[in-house]
Regions:
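C-terminal outer-membrane beta-barrel translocator/porin domains of Gram-negative envelope proteins
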Residues: 299-304, 308-447, 454
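Short beta-strands and strand-coil junctions in structured, solvent-facing domains, enriched
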Residues: 87, 114, 160-162, 187-188, ...
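C-terminal beta-signal and terminal closure region of outer-membrane beta-barrel proteins
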Residues: 450-503
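Bacterial N-terminal signal peptides
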Residues: 7-16
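Periplasmic polypeptide-binding modules associated with outer-membrane biogenesis and secretion
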Residues: 2, 20-171, 175, 180, ...
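Gram-negative/organellar outer-membrane beta-barrel architecture
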Residues: 131, 137-314, 320, 398-405, ...
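Transmembrane beta-barrel strands of outer-membrane/channel proteins
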Residues: 165-169, 179, 193-199, 224-232, ...
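Bacterial N-terminal signal peptides that target proteins for export
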Residues: 1-7
Length: 503
């Protein structure tokens, strides 16, 4: 069983305002799935519909009267912050001060003062703010007359910075302690710092990344990201079925960093980065190993160490209703990574990948009940291929908690090409507990034979695999805890626990 626990503070509180017409409810699921709004005009009744977690659907006339709407202008936009007690004022009667700069928030909006009011732009702006990791909850209200509209955003921020303490044990390094620091809103501009240090009796591992996001209000300024990392684990490609000549399992170490720039174009986010990774294969005492027990090479260079210098370009389109535990929408990510033949191994390759996720709300058994685990279908498709020569440790390892459940990590295939399809039916059990029925299928399309040393073929990995099962999702102070019981098409049964949704 692999257990990963991260401390995440999640608070869900509904905000309502007097004399304001609500056009979207909060991300909280504590409200019913519909609510009615009646305008002050006597000739028309307007109803606003809401999905769980506050996804704004729109305004729909409920009678057959013909009505003319004037082109009302957005007169003013106000930003208000609320605290964890759902209050706009502090104990001294002063407005709550948020960390986020109000100019930054307004700069993210498409609907600005002086422009013609449009429902579709308001919906897009609301979803854009809800996808920011620094915000826990976003509401928008409007005040309007015949000619103008005032928009009032009420925002509850997440509790950052946060300090994460943890520890555990694994078969590679034994007992370890972990310290993490995370801030998603540095300088009030949603800049991000995420660092983790893990210390054990065998080594020190770390992962640190700073990201300054692209800001639409500063179109001539590019965002940027800097990362450094060092980690080691049991190899998923060279697993325990064939060990080293001394009987040890193959350990895989990775050390490196990256520097990238970020830019957004309409609804697309793009990134290009320069990356360096040194991959080394080692035994239990972390001595470099060149071949396994059968004499098969572990690296392209033949030394047990390969250097990867790459240029990565990726684009993504995020249309989820929110970033964390989304309830509807989709996200598409496409990437290409070109390796430059420098360093050990002289590696020249191109790695292409695509990832698509769709969230579809359904109402088969939930009946609109308030819940933190709304009923829905979640669908994920992935595909990838590598052209050229590449380290066998960098093959696509299929199988495990984040691919085909019911199999161990890398137990389905280690291939040059892969395709993956997953479907989950998520449904509420109680307010904070949800259930999941899932199925996963993946294949290497026969490409394991083209990987250097054929590690997947020699270890009798099937090349394709199917898994299904059920799981629980529990909303807790640690975040969303996921427990999945998977059954493989070979009859293997595995129960694993981690945090966060599978996708």
């Amino acid at each position: 069983m692999r257990i990963q626990i991260a401390l995440v503070a999640i608070a869900v509180i509904l905000i309502a305002g007097e004399n304001l017409e609500a056009v979207a409810d909060s991300q909280s699921s504590t409200e019913d799935s519909t609510s009615s709004i009646v305008t002050t005009k006597p000739t028309l009744q307007i109803e606003a519909e809401y999905a769980k977690y506050g996804d704004y659907i729109g305004l729909t006339p409920v009678d057959n009267q013909s009505t003319e709407f004037s082109q009302r202008i957005v007169k003013d936009i106000q930003i208000r912050f609320v605290n964890n007690k759902d209050q706009l004022l502090d104990d001294k009667g002063q407005p709550i001060k948020g960390r986020t700069q109000k100019e930054f928030i307004i700069g993210l909006l498409k609907l600005k003062p002086g422009e013609v009011f449009r429902e579709d732009l308001l919906k897009a702006d609301l979803q854009r703010l809800r996808r920011l990791e620094s915000f826990n909850e976003v509401n928008v209200y409007r005040q309007e007359d015949a000619n103008s509209v005032n928009l009032i955003y009420e925002i509850k921020e997440r509790d950052f910075p946060s300090l994460i303490l943890g520890g555990g044990s694994n078969e590679d390094v034994g007992l370890f302690g972990r310290l993490g620091y995370k801030d998603e809103n540095i300088s009030g501009l949603n800049d991000k710092l995420d660092t983790t240090v893990q210390i054990s009796g065998k080594d020190v591992q770390f992962n640190g990344q700073f990201t300054s996001r692209y800001r639409p209000q500063e179109p001539n300024r590019l965002g940027y990201s800097i990362r450094a990392f060092r980690n080691r684990n049991i190899s998923g490609t060279f697993n325990e079925d064939i060990r080293l000549s001394n009987g040890d399992k193959v350990r895989e170490g990775r050390f490196g960093g990256s520097v990238g720039v970020l830019r957004s174009f309409d609804e697309w986010d793009a990134a290009i980065s320069l990356n360096y990774t040194r991959i080394s294969l080692r035994d239990r005492e972390y001595n470099v190993a060149q071949v396994d027990r059968l004499g098969s090479p572990l690296s392209v260079s033949g030394t047990g160490i390969d250097d990867l210098y790459t240029v990565l370009f990726s684009v993504s389109r995020d249309q989820r209703d929110r970033r964390e535990n989304p309830t509807q929408g989709s996200i598409l990510t496409l990437s290409t990574e070109q390796a430059i033949p420098i360093g050990l191994g002289n590696i020249s390759s191109n790695r292409l990948q695509g990832d698509y996720i769709q969230y579809l709300p359904v109402s088969w058994i939930g009946n609109g009940r308030p819940t933190d685990n709304p009923e829905m279908l979640a669908i994920n498709f992935q595909i990838g291929t590598i052209f050229g020569n590449f380290p066998p440790a960098d093959a696509f390892n299929i199988g495990g908690l984040d691919s085909v459940r019911g199999y161990g990590y890398g137990k389905v295939a280690s291939g040059q090409i892969y395709g993956l399809a997953s479907v989950e039916y998520r449904f509420p059990i109680s307010y904070s507990i949800g259930g999941v029925l899932f199925t996963d299928f993946a294949s290497d399309f026969g490409s394991s034979e083209t990987v250097l040393g054929e590690p997947g073929v020699l270890r009798d990995k099937p090349g394709s695999g199917f898994g299904y099962g059920l799981g629980l999702r529990v909303k807790s102070s640690f975040g969303l805890i996921r427990g999945d019981l998977g059954i493989s098409d070979r009859g293997e049964l595995r129960f694993e626990v981690t945090t966060g949704q599978r996708f």
